Amino acid sequence: MTLYTPKQLADSMRVVRKNTIAIAEDIPEAQYDYRPTQGSRSVRETLLHMASMTLFDLHIHEEQKRTSMDGFDFREFFAGLPTNEKNSLPKSVIVAVLRDGGERWCDWVEKLPEAQAAEFVTRGGAGPGDKSRFEMLIGSKEHEIHHRAQLMVIQRLLGIVPHLTRNRQRPQESAKESTT
């Protein structure tokens, strides 16, 4: 029984990434180096970190088709990416990378054969137990949602009302105006 297909995952990730891009666009570039606490990621670092995950998935599951994470050097991989979170890429480039990388990831996941999605990857030193490729890809979507929530809190700290809240408030404001 299939409960959730690669196409459905790609469709839902498109919504997640669209909302991430809206946040990236809403935050002024002058605030991209803001970090809410010492030792936390800045807005720029968080967005680059999120963009890196789609590259990670494509590398692991499409290019290398790894069946085991044993011997994979996570630090080296992420340090070598153009989206390394320590790079000072401008806002326009970050938004473009989020848009293009997200769509590339979604296009690939959408066409992923279910048999390949069901393959298990031994996690080795990356964590206990094996996971299917599909579970790992869902984990990437959850990971982005987690960091997007952090960015929404940062928006509030910067005095920005997140777009999802603004969108929800508009119909309520229109209803109030029509009754007065």
Indicate where each model-derived feature is located.
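Surface-exposed patches in mature extracellular/periplasmic domains of secreted proteins
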Residues: 32-35
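Alpha-helical transition-metal enzyme core signature, strongest for iron centers
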Residues: 13-20, 43-58, 95-105, 109, ...
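Residues at secondary-structure transition points
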Residues: 4, 11, 37-45, 88-92, ...
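Short, helix-capping/interhelical loops that line the mouth of catalytic, cofactor-
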Residues: 1-8, 52-129, 158-180
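Membrane-proximal, proline-rich intrinsically disordered regions
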Residues: 27-29
